[in-house]
């Protein structure tokens, strides 16, 4: 399967800024995108339509939502349904991002509902998991990741594996901090995630792509992508500028 290089633009960029960055990115990458790479950009909801227009004729580029609500429609002020994301041109959605877990209080059960509902609606999902620093220091890495996967995938059957499900490992202590998990730490965590997915879904589970996220930058992308069981990257701050993100895509 192709390496997936995903950008999470979080709460940055106006529509015009998103369109300009998207065009710069296409100009920098489209003609030289390796056959084994695909690009996903998750902008703010307001910029989805603009980026869809920018990427619609560019092979290997897709857009996704940063979040979703597990309902078809309803009186859920401020939320967005999977069908609305699809209507805006999205093929993907993020669920369980650490900032939603730890800033907005989303629990594993909420993440599970969003993940299952989105898959059933026809979106592909990047499910984010990862431990906090105190959990790693307490030797609880396996317990934390196993629990997040067990609950987060509780209602996801093998129908969606491996083609529609991606798991992103993002150690919380490395997100936006400038700290990067060392190669041995990344390999350990990704091997653990791979074994847990294989135990749950068998051979197809072992084929689920696992991304690394956490202070990914142009100067560490190639090393991260070379590590065992790293099938792509989830990029935050370094994806906001086309110059730096294009270097990561082509690393």
From Swiss-Prot:
Localization in the cell: Cytoplasm
Pfam family, one: TIM
InterPro entries named among the record's database cross-references: Aldolase_TIM, TIM_sf, TrioseP_Isoase_bac/euk, Triosephosphate_isomerase, Triosephosphate_isomerase_AS
Keywords: Cytoplasm, Gluconeogenesis, Glycolysis, Isomerase
Disulfide cross-links: none
CDD domains, alphabetized: TIM
Residues annotated as binding substrate: 8-10, 176, 215, 236-237
The keyword Protein biosynthesis belongs to this UniProt entry's keyword annotation: no
GO cellular component, one term: cytosol
Associated pathway: Carbohydrate biosynthesis; gluconeogenesis; Carbohydrate degradation; glycolysis; D-glyceraldehyde 3-phosphate from glycerone phosphate: step 1/1
Active site feature: 97, 170
Keyword Repeat assigned: no
GO molecular function: triose-phosphate isomerase activity
Catalytic activity from the UniProt record: D-glyceraldehyde 3-phosphate = dihydroxyacetone phosphate
Single Gene Ontology BP annotation: glycerol catabolic process
EC number: 5.3.1.1
Enzyme class: isomerase
SUPFAM superfamilies reported for this sequence: Triosephosphate isomerase (TIM)
Function: Involved in the gluconeogenesis. Catalyzes stereospecifically the conversion of dihydroxyacetone phosphate (DHAP) to D-glyceraldehyde-3-phosphate (G3P).
Entry's family note: Belongs to the triosephosphate isomerase family.
Quaternary assembly: Homodimer.
Alphabetical list of PANTHER family matching this protein: TRIOSEPHOSPHATE ISOMERASE
UniProt name for this protein: Triosephosphate isomerase
Lineage, broadest ranks: Bacteria, Pseudomonadati, Thermodesulfobacteriota, Desulfovibrionia, Desulfovibrionales
Gene that this polypeptide is encoded by: tpiA
